[in-house]
Amino acid sequence: MTNATQNSGDARYLIPALAPIYARLAPLAETLLRVVVGVAFVIHGWPKIQNPLGAVEMVQGIGFYPGWLWATALAATEFFGGLLLIAGLLTRPAALATTFVLLVTVWFHWVQMDQGYKGAELSIIWASVTLFFALNGAGRYSVDRLIGRQI
């Protein structure tokens, strides 16, 4: 790549001298976001694994039957999906599964609880983030990238 080509590509930045910094930090920011989302899912999934009967009661209490099936799926998706996101392993399927869980929570808050956007706001934000990883993959710093395979 010539200097002229590099400079014309940097013209999109208000301060072109920052382009190398952006290029270096963008993959780190993407990794940080993926890890934070993964940790959040692990934190939400762990109590459901520790107290499966409580998880069954919770999902049945909001209308999902059979409770044992939905509680198991929810706990596994949150906990193990979170671990996969943290590692950046099987990122697309893990992110797709967590996106589905979040879309169910959006529906629940919006329709079932009649809270509209106010109740579903955080789920919409998190679903947007997990959808990003479902479509784009884990990024540079991930096990997926290390092994050279992505689904």
Where do the protein language model's features map onto the residues?
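Membrane-interface interhelical connector segments
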Residues: 50-66
